[in-house]
Amino acid sequence: QQGHDVTIATRGQHDNPFDERVHHTILDRTNSSELRKAFEGTVYDIVYDNICYTPKEAMELCAILNDHTTRLIFTSTMSVYEADGVAKREEDFNAMNYIYDLIPSQQHSYAEGKRQAEAVFEDYANFPVVAVRFPIVMGEDDYTSRLSYYVEHIEQGEAIEFVNLDAEMSFILADEAAEFLYWAGFANIEGPYNATANGKISMRKLIQTIEQVVDKEAIIVEGTSPYSIPASWYMTNAKATEAGFTFTQLTDWLKPLIEKIAK
């Protein structure tokens, strides 16, 4: 839409949703030889990596992109922070000098994989890297169905599980996440940036909102579920706001989203 020359790289398990408007390369992100071949003879102004989960993958990407790109936008996560009830700022996890293991004795957790990937980019990338730390992403087409889990269970009179209803979380809408990634590609920024809608919500308030929408009372038991966390887990977006991005208000879109899911 903006007139850019765009190439997407996927495993080819789904059709290219953009038809001939973008180039489509089929590859396995975890296969370094396929990845290297895809960049042969090509230089990209901006590369977006949404599926780097380990320090090894980050290291391989640096080895390839050091001669083939001028800028990388790496999709990281709020999971690099501990859920300890304190609002998280970017400096609460510093990837510089963080220890990473390229040949781990056991598979990295999602959070640890992202921490170590950020650390590798700090050490080995000779191009600017923006690490975008997203909270849980919400949307109508969320393949994880995390919000849908609560809506459907309450609608059907089935129990939902929590360990702390007063725990608060931050979220971002899928469309807003996409807008932020685009902005990050062209903004004069570098390093880690939290990207989250303004505001936070307790699990109690979230469930009450769903109850209002579906007109049913939730059955709540103690246990684990997608949003069941022991303590509040949310971020501040002040750094990105100061850099020029305008975030939405969580309260403006959460209830309308629940209404769409409940239909």
List PLM regions with ranges.
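NAD(P)H-binding glycine-rich loop region in Rossmannoid oxidoreductase-like domains
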Residues: 13-69, 82
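Alpha-helical substrate-binding/gating segment
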Residues: 151-161, 166-195
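Amphipathic terminal alpha-helices
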Residues: 4, 251-263
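Glycine-rich "substrate-gating" loop/helix at the edge of Rossmann-like oxidoreductase active sites
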Residues: 107, 135-144, 164-174
